[in-house]
């Protein structure tokens, strides 16, 4: 009882000291409850909606108190730019939750300082240069054709289908090919379906509030059930990744012994060469590979699923996209598909951007942490604060976007500057390393998909109500596939 009284006293003493000091004006904030603060706002499985309502009331920068963790939410492009571009070094660190320590800090997503700089500099060698990622285009094209093959039996029988699983396997195969230089041949393979399920579960549970992350004293009394499940799933994925990495190491050693100069066949080979040179630890290789497989498959597949729903509900836009893509094929020499020709499909490109904006897949991005005190937009933010990039509000506010809830691809055709306000892949030095590979994959897969198949439904498919989590996923639905 005495401990609780002391905690409450210290909490309010700190709160009053910071908020009554005129030199340390804090961002506006909703009413804060003792001990738990504003944790109740996380209990909803759609926290982006709660934070969007706070944005409409308190503006582009506001403060929340999650237990003992001071949290600042940034919700418009200009304030995000001020933080992550103009003051990027202050906001560069990740905020790591206590119950996620099992993920370790030896990966590209959660690491900070020298470890992150090392992993970032190595990974960007394969993920950033266009000439490097271009070599993966034939693989992406081949996988898209395999996806279409998986739909053929439904096309022939005129059966309606939920395409979600097939699309997730397609993008998982793409990232597995990128990482390990192999793919799952059968879209009904139980192993690949299990992987898809693991990844889906990680993103569904990822946003569930765990009180111990914000009130550490609770760790002494119980372990959250969600944490146990989350940890077990990660252990299964780590085991899978380690087996695949070990296979690549054996191939690498064999090629090296045979004086085969073509030893760097995939991304993991690059990491293993650094490992063999003592530049990376084994754990860093495993954890970084895990990050890329999980992030690289889920978000891209969910984007494509949202695109299919959006264009199924808007047949006129789907037809315009098809006609432009068909014209692209006719005019394109030898029907060669390459991301470097994307300027030849302006309307299709604008549709992709509008789906990215209107149906944001990752509404709140990965949290950051300030590494020193800073004044932002006239407000004081102390060192160690959790910073949330509110992507959802940034993409749907009426200051940056005219009629933000209207699906209107033409907005990007008429204003080239709007694309800069899309922050799906983050902002600043910690933005998504693989965003160029992701954009290339999405462009190629959907170009071939909408050239080959017409998606239709007898009724409108639900767009607004989505399954919550770290990413937003449409609920199960069925559509008809018609061969073009």
Curated annotation (Swiss-Prot):
Family recorded in the similarity comment: Belongs to the cytochrome P450 family.
Protein name per UniProt: Probable cytochrome P450 555A1
Membrane topology: Single-pass membrane protein
Pfam families: p450
Protein location: Membrane
Alphabetically ordered keywords of this record: Heme, Iron, Membrane, Metal-binding, Monooxygenase, Oxidoreductase, Transmembrane, Transmembrane helix
Membrane-spanning parts: 1-21
Binding site for heme: 432
Domain of life per record: Eukaryota
E.C. numbers: 1.14.-.-
Cofactor dependence: heme
PROSITE patterns: CYTOCHROME_P450
Gene Ontology biological process terms in this record: organic acid metabolic process; xenobiotic metabolic process
